[in-house]
Each structure stands twice: as C-alpha cells, then as structure tokens.
Amino acid sequence: MFFFQHQNNDLTFKSRSIEHAYIAILNNDLASAEAVFKSIDSPRANWGVSLVQILNGFLERFPTYFEIRNFLEIDLDFLIKNDKIDYVESVLGALKILSGINQETYKYIARVMYENRFYNASREYLEKSKSIMYHDPEMHFMFAKYYLNDRDYQNASHYVNECLKILPDYYPAKQLKKEISKYWSL
C-alpha cells in the first residue's frame, strides 16, 4: 500500500509516498515533490527526482535509459490529463537531452500524443523517431496506426509492411494489416 500503511493493526496515512510526491506536483509544490522523491529508495523515485528537475528547468540528476523507458510516458500522460501544460512543455523541452540517453524517447512521446488525440504532434515525434531509429518496428506500427486513423490507407499499408519486414511475426502488426486490408488492397 502506498498512501496508507499498517501499524499495529491500525491503518495510518503514509506521508512519504510516491503518490504524495505526485500530488505535490499537481499542487505546483515542486520543492516538496523533490524532497519526497529523494527520501524514497526506488527506481520510480529516482526518476521522480529527474522529472521534478526537468519541470524546474534545471537537470542535475540525469535519468537512466530504463527510467526514461519505464516512466516518461506515464508521467507525460499524467501531466496532460491533469492540464499541467507548463509542465508538459518543460518535459517536451528536455527531449533532446532525454533522447541522448534513450533513443526511443521520441517514439514514447509520439505514443502519448497519439493516445491523447494530439495526432499532428504524434506524427511530428514519429518523424523525429524515424530519423534516429528507422529500423524500429514499433515506430512503423505506430505510423501505420496514425495513417489508418487519418484514413490514408496507402501510407498505413506502407508502414505496416515496413514493420513486418523488420519483425515478421509481430502479432499486432499482422492484425493491423488485416484491418487495413479492409480498406486498401495490400
């Protein structure tokens, strides 16, 4: 349990939790959020320290490859869904640094943008991802989804086929290819 803890059969509020830090972020109390993250020994909290520093505009603790992979999408989605637009802009402003650590960063951002229906932004980040890692099958799959949503069946077909050239047994792409074929002869 995160917000609460058991002590002698009593349930008490746990003030130093990951959730407490995220509530502090929502309340624009970045100093408290950082202090809470620093008091917790976990990969999520380590990422949280980096996130707060990104939100403050001064990154001292660089996140690891795996921290970016595991938490960037979740937290960007959290900030978008809670209308923390200034914080979203801060995260997006740090993408060049983050992509230097994890080359898949732009793909992660593209997925968050797509799922939040920011389709044009999603496409822009997919293009950046493509320029860095063309042979990423998931990136091609995401392009195919984007173009299918845009009813551009020719490009959707192209990208799903590119995905399957790289990873022939990728089940989601096989299923997407079937869906695209309803609209476009492959």
Regions found by a protein language model. Name each.
Residues 11, 45, 66-67, 100, ...:
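Short coil turns that delineate tetratricopeptide repeat
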Residues 26, 55, 81, 115, ...:
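Register position in tetratricopeptide repeats
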Residues 30, 58-59, 85, 119, ...:
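TPR-repeat structural position
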